[in-house]
Structures are given as structure tokens and as C-alpha cells.
């Protein structure tokens, strides 16, 4: 970010549109969830987009978050003893979080790219990823989610139905509505009468 110059023209318009998608209320909810999920040791960021970005930038908080959603002994992300200071180590830590989130079930379309967070290019995408992760945690309901379940929407789950052979045979005798109905007005019993007589 230090080596990036200011954006002009169309680039600035695009960047300002991206920045308008960032939701401050959602940031508050995400911070509350991360603190509830990981414990108060993660601290709290300064309010605003930049404070949120600085808090998550080294990848440690994100790694602790995704690790807290797994049972003990099967933590997917290795967290170093001291927070990484080198740029490539921080980006690698973020990439490990993204891989673990994908393994947890977050779809690729909900994932942010490493530069979206590291260079604060699209913090709204970071929020989308965290919301998707929270929704999955609430949906799985495996006891590892901490916080208010109403913070995230529960995803729809499959409701598989099993039919016996006799039920399937009975279904063959029913006329489906796609085939039309056998009740109501029809041409049954109509008589046509005589043809029209044309005499010149």
C-alpha cells in the first residue's frame, strides 16, 4: 500500500464504488463475533475500515477465528508464536486462513483475495467472507460456534425424503396437474348440427 500511488479517473471511480459497499454496522457485528469466538486476547480494532483492516492484516486473528470453529486436535492453520512482521509471511498467513475457510465450506465466490485485505482494496469482500463463514458455523450447529446465532443467517439444509415401493406404485395412479385435469368443461356430448347452407 505504501508503494501504490493515488488512483485517478475511472480507477478512482471504481475504487470509490467498492469502498461504498463497506458496512460499518456489519463491522461492529463481525468484531463482536470474532471477540466472542476467539476470546478477548485478540483485542479490538479501531473503528472504521482502516482500523478493521489493520487488525486483520497479519492473518493471526483470522487464523484464530477459523481454528476456533474446529475441535481441539484438528486445527487447520498453524499459528506462529509471534505475529509475522514480514509481508510475505503475513500474506501466507491470510492464504492459510482462506484455504481453511474453503475446506470448512465457504464457496469460492464468497472468498476475498489476499490483496483485498492486505492492501485494503476491497474490505467489503473481507466482510462477505466472514459473514459466509459465520453463516456456515451457525448452520453446522456442532457446538463450536460462540456468539448470538441471530448475527448470521442460517443456510437452508437438504430435506431428503424416502418413499416405499408401495407409495411409489400409488403415485402412478394419480394424474398430475401437469397433465391437465379430467374435470370441468369439456367437449364431451357436444353435437355439431348441420353445416351452413350457402345458396347462390
UniProtKB/Swiss-Prot annotation:
<feature type="modified residue" description="N-acetylalanine">
    <location>
        <position position="2"/>
    </location>
</feature>
<keyword id="KW-0963">Cytoplasm</keyword>
<comment type="similarity">
    <text>Belongs to the calponin family.</text>
</comment>
<keyword id="KW-0007">Acetylation</keyword>
<protein>
    <recommendedName>
        <fullName>Transgelin</fullName>
    </recommendedName>
</protein>
<feature type="repeat" description="Calponin-like">
    <location>
        <begin position="175"/>
        <end position="199"/>
    </location>
</feature>
<dbReference type="GO" id="GO:0005737">
    <property type="term" value="C:cytoplasm"/>
</dbReference>
<dbReference type="InterPro" id="IPR003096">
    <property type="entry name" value="SM22_calponin"/>
</dbReference>
<comment type="subunit">
    <text>Monomer.</text>
</comment>
<dbReference type="Pfam" id="PF00402">
    <property type="entry name" value="Calponin"/>
</dbReference>
<feature type="domain" description="Calponin-homology (CH)">
    <location>
        <begin position="24"/>
        <end position="137"/>
    </location>
</feature>
<dbReference type="Pfam" id="PF00307">
    <property type="entry name" value="CH"/>
</dbReference>
<comment type="function">
    <text>Actin cross-linking/gelling protein.</text>
</comment>
<keyword id="KW-0514">Muscle protein</keyword>
<dbReference type="InterPro" id="IPR050606">
    <property type="entry name" value="Calponin-like"/>
</dbReference>
<dbReference type="InterPro" id="IPR000557">
    <property type="entry name" value="Calponin_repeat"/>
</dbReference>
<dbReference type="InterPro" id="IPR036872">
    <property type="entry name" value="CH_dom_sf"/>
</dbReference>
<dbReference type="InterPro" id="IPR001715">
    <property type="entry name" value="CH_dom"/>
</dbReference>
Amino acid at each position: 500500500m505504501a508503494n501504490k500511488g493515488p488512483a485517478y479517473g475511472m480507477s478512482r471511480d471504481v475504487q470509490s464504488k467498492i469502498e461504498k459497499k463497506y458496512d460499518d454496522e456489519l463491522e461492529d457485528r463481525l468484531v463482536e463475533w470474532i471477540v466472542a469466538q476467539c476470546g478477548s486476547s485478540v483485542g479490538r480494532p479501531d473503528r472504521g475500515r482502516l482500523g478493521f483492516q489493520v487488525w486483520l492484516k497479519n492473518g493471526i486473528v483470522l487464523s484464530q477465528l477459523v481454528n476456533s470453529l474446529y475441535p481441539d486436535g484438528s486445527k487447520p492453520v498453524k499459528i506462529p508464536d509471534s505475529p509475522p512482521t514480514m509481508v510475505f509471511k503475513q500474506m501466507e498467513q491470510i492464504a492459510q486462513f482462506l484455504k481453511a475457510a474453503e475446506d470448512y465450506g465457504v464457496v469460492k465466490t464468497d472468498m476475498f483475495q489476499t490483496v483485498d485485505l492486505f492492501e485494503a482494496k476491497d474490505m467489503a469482500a473481507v466482510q462477505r467472507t466472514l459473514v459466509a463463514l459465520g453463516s456456515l458455523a451457525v448452520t453446522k450447529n456442532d457446538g463450536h460456534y460462540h456468539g448470538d446465532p441471530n448475527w448470521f443467517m442460517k443456510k437452508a439444509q437438504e430435506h431428503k425424503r424416502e418413499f416405499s415401493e408401495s407409495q411409489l406404485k400409488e403415485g402412478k395412479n394419480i394424474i398430475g396437474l401437469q397433465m391437465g385435469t379430467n374435470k370441468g368443461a369439456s367437449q364431451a356430448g357436444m353435437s355439431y348440427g348441420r353445416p351452413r347452407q350457402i345458396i347462390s
